[in-house]
A protein has these predicted regions:
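Sec-dependent bacterial lipoprotein signal peptides
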Residues: 1-16
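Cyclophilin-like peptidyl-prolyl cis-trans isomerases
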Residues: 2, 18-215
């Protein structure tokens, strides 16, 4: 019975993806370049390619995630998940996560966000316009406060992430790239909100902004 519960929760963490020409055309049609020829985010938060590697893996990176229910501080694991950390930091610095909601909240499991459509479907493969490979070398367990990527299967990471509300024995199929070090009470508060169909909060819980720092 316990294994069946884990399997059912694994399905919840899947990001619904879409393959085929229609999705590709949507991405191509909604991406632009600036005057310098650099890839930029379109108005509806779609990119032509994943961010270039810009972080220094020798540095310690943290972020302040300000939400409508309080503030959390996250420490990133750039040593074990450098590409994922670079992706999250790049999107954060570009304002990608600003005003995006936590679209799925499951008390006793996790809170999930990062989808501009606010559905978890990512507009069926539209957001953020690219995918990248898993980084599964972390020895961290999926415990309270862990920050990890939601996906649609192996090597399909994009912008959606989840934060563990409780310790849970998930299989290592989701890239762990950080942990909440301050503001665990905010996770508690978010996990306690009333939800409706699809585990979506009745009243939106919104990411107001993400501020990244490095030592």
């Amino acid at each position: 019975m316990f294994n069946l519960k884990i399997i059912s929760l694994l399905f919840i963490l899947l990001v619904t993806a879409c393959s085929g020409e229609n999705a590709e055309e949507t991405i191509n049609n909604t991406t632009n370049e600036n005057d310098k020829g650099e890839i930029t985010m379109s108005e509806d938060k779609v990119y032509a390619a994943m961010p270039e590697m810009t972080i220094d893996t020798g540095k310690k990176y943290t972020a302040k995630i300000e939400t409508s229910m309080g503030e959390m501080k996250v420490e990133f694991f750039s040593d074990t998940a450098p590409v994922t950390v670079n992706n999250f930091i790049s999107l954060s610095n570009d304002g990608y996560y600003d005003n995006i909601i936590f679209h799925r909240v499951i008390s006793g499991f996790m809170i999930q966000g990062g989808d501009p459509s606010g559905t978890g479907h990512g507009e069926y493969g539209k957001y953020p316009g690219y995918t990248f490979n898993d980084e599964l070398d972390s020895q961290q367990p999926y415990e309270k406060g862990i920050l990890a990527m939601a996906n649609a299967g192996p090597n399909t990471n994009g912008s959606q992430f989840f934060i563990m509300y409780v310790d849970y024995p998930l299989p290592y199929q989701y890239t762990i790239f950080g942990k909440v070090t301050e503001g665990l009470d905010v996770i508690d508060a978010i996990a306690g909100v009333q939800t409706a169909e699809g585990d979506r909060p009745v009243n939106d819980v919104t990411i107001l902004g993400v501020t990244v720092s490095s030592d």
